[in-house]
Amino acid sequence: MKMKRFFAAAVAASLSASLIACGSGNNTSDTAANQTNGTSQQTTTSAAAGQSEETTAGTCQYVDNEDPYTVVMGYIGLEKPDEVMIENAINEILEKELNAKLDLKCFSWGEFVQKIQLSLTGTDKLDIVPVMVNTAPGYVASGLVLDLKELIDTYGTNIKKYVDPDFINSPNINGYIYGVTPMDEQISWQGVIMRRDLLEEAGYTVNDETDMCEEITSLEDLTEVMAKVQEKHPEMTMMCSSAAGTPLVHWDAMDKLTDGFGVLMDYGQSTEVVNLYETEELKAFVQTMKEWNEAGYFSKDAITTTTSITEQVMTGKYFAYMTTMKAGAVTQDELSSKMDLAGAAIFGNPVLTSNSVNFLTWGIGRNCENPARTMKVLDYIYGSPEVMNLLCWGIEGTHYKFVDKEQGIIDYVDGQDGTTSGWMMGLGWQFPNQEIAYTAAPDTPAKWDYQHELIDTAVRSKALGFSYDSSSLVNELTALANVKNQYFDMLGSGNVDDVDAVLKEFNDALYTAGLQKVIDEKQRQLDEWLATQGSTAE
C-alpha cells in the first residue's frame, strides 16, 4: 500500500513527460506497419483509430501456435537481487502448464514513463506492459498496445472469473480495451493517517478493529486535532508535505476524468465537465491550507523538500499525512514506519472512478510476437495462487515465513524487512490478482471481504468506464501540465498571500494554455458515451 501511494505521486509528477512522449510523432510508419504475430497479423493503424477488426463470432485473429515462448513482463519498482530466482520458480510452473517462460523486466520508479515509452516505440521485446491511466491515451493513439477485447473473450477465462465485468470494460478508449485491471484495492477514498499515541493523548478514540478514528470526518475536525497536538508538542510538525506531494494531491471530491483538466464534481455524480480550479470547493480547501500554513502546521520546506512522505513519517517528527485510504492501509503503513497509527476519512465515502479502477492495468505491447500465448500466460497468472505468491512474496523460507499457515498469513523471514529482502517488496497491489495470494501480517484474509463490501457500497461515478481520447489535445495538455506545475504545490500547501488573486492568475494561465478546448472535448466525448449508457448530461 505504501508503495502504491508513492507510485501515485510518481505518476502525477511524470504526467507532463508522458504527454510529450506519447505525442511525439510515433504514430507514423511504426503505427502503420503490420506486426506479424505467429499465424496472424494485427494492423496498428486501426488501433490508432480506436477500432477493433470485425471477426467471426467465436474466433480470434490471434492464434497460439503452441511453440515454446518467453513472455517479457514489465513491472515498476526497485530491481531486487533475487529476481532470477523468482523467474526460475515461476517457469517451473509455466513450462509445464503452458510451454512458456516469464522474463521479468523492472522499470525504476523515477524513469518508468520514459523507459516503457522507449521500449514500446523501439524494437525491445515487451509483451506484458504496465499501462498507467495517464499514459493509456497516448499508447492507444499511437498503436503502442493492442486491443485486448478479442484476446480476453477467447483466452481470458480467469480474468472473467475474478475481475468485475465493469472493471474489465473500464480500461477502454472508444471501445478499445487497452489493459486488464489487477485485482487489488480498486476502491479508495482520501483521508489522513496520524500518530495514534498523540491522537489518543489529545482525547480521541480509535476503533481497534478498523484502526480508524470516527470522530474526525472533515478538514475542520482535523484542524482542531492538530491544534491540540501542537499545543502539547510544539516541537513537532503537524502535517507532512513535499514537492509534488502536498495535501492537495489527496483532495479528491471529484472524478478527475484522467488528468484533472476538466472534472465531474460531487464524486462524479454530476455529468457537467467543469474547471476544478474555479470551484468554491477548491477555493475553500486552499483557504484551509493557508490557515494551516499560517498556524505553522507545515514545515518551512513543505513544497521544496524531496524527502518522501514515508521518510518524513519515519523520523518521528511529524504527526499526520494525507493519503489514499484503502482496506488495510493503516496496518501496511504501521509495518513500514514501525509506529502505531490511526486513520480518518475526511473527504467522504469510498468512490469508484475510471481513474481508481484504471490506475494501473496490464496491456500487451505492439512488439509482442505471440499475443495469444501472452494473454494465456497473463490469464494463468490471474488464476494461479502459486505464481501470484511468487510474484508478491517470493519463496518460503528465503523471503517469507508463515505466521498462520491455515489462514495464509505471512511475514518477512527473521532479520529481513522491505529494504533488505531479496524480493518481497510490497508490490502485490501491482501484480494481476493479489486476492488469491497470501496476506502479509498484520492483515488477515478478512481484508478482502472488507474490500468487497466497500466496492458493493461505494459511490460509483456516473463516468465509471469512460476514458476520453486525448490524442487531439497533446499540445494543450502539455501546456496545461506546465502551468499546473507552477501553481499546484504553493496552493496545496497554502503558501500564498492572497488565495483569490493566485487562483485568478492560475485560472487565467490555464485558459490561455487551452483549458476550455480540453473541457469542451471531454464534455462532447462524455455526452456521446453517456448516450450509449442510457444516461444524459445534467
Where in the sequence are the language-model features?
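Bacterial Sec-dependent N-terminal signal peptides
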Residues: M1-A10
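Extracytoplasmic/secretory soluble proteins
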Residues: A9-A10, L15, L19-E538
